[in-house]
Amino acid sequence: LIGDRYEVYSLDIKDKEFPVDIRNFFYFEEEFDTVIHLAALVNVSRSTYYPDEYFDTNVNGTRNVLKTLKYKNFILASTGSAAGMLSPYGISKRMAELIVENYCKEKNIDYTIFRFYNVTGSDGIEPTNPDGLFASLMRAEKEGTFYLYGDKYNTKDGSCIRDYTHVNEICSALIKAIEKPANKLENLGHGIGTSVKEMIEIYKRVNNCNFNVEVKPGRPGDLEVSVLKDISSYMTKSYTIDELMKRYG
């Protein structure tokens, strides 16, 4: 976003001084057309060890953003983990969903809540989530070993099954929600399940690389199967599973 058309500021949404800090940056009184709230802590496993951090950022931080800025349309990035609420991460995001829904309805503000499902894909930028599948595969390609967490699940090959989406598909959905708010929760997935073991082999094939796979115990909070059943009209399938795993750059 750093360029002639954008201004970028670094703020802590959970800081008690956030309302003061952000008003110092945005000193004008006009409303924003849309706020897209993407800031969050997202590591499922880590949330089981540091739940307070996740509730502070994902719940209190969301409340700060909601109540500090003026806007006509609010978009919340949530997660499929909010459905099962099997981890502090999932619970914190579900709480954020409810806060956004109730606040926007009370204030008569347009809103959309998007639950993302396993976003992957690359456009030449290093993945920001070091524990995500794509980042882990890129690291394995460089270092020689991929760590597979759990291979004893009740699935076709023992590894977790997920519904994968491309980051550009998610961006397209966000743009649609700017233009036409849903005023409800929408799930962003394709309803197609692919196992982690299958994704490993696809990554090796499309990127012409090889590495070892070392099995580790399953991580706390990981769902065995997470595949979407109800497909949102905001979601358009634009990439094949091979394209999802293609490393650019």
Sequence positions of predicted segments:
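NAD(P)-dependent short-chain dehydrogenase/reductase
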Residues: 88, 101-176, 200-204
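N-terminal Rossmann-like NAD(P)+-binding domain of SDR-like oxidoreductases, especially those catalyzing
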Residues: 1-122
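Mid/C-terminal beta-alpha module of Rossmann-like enzyme folds, strongest
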Residues: 140, 173-218
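Conserved C-terminal active-site "lid" loop/helix of NAD(P)H-dependent oxidoreductases
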Residues: 167, 216-243
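Residues in well-ordered alpha-helical elements
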Residues: 26, 45, 52, 63, ...
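Generic structural signal for residues in well-ordered beta-strands
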Residues: 8, 111, 146, 211-213
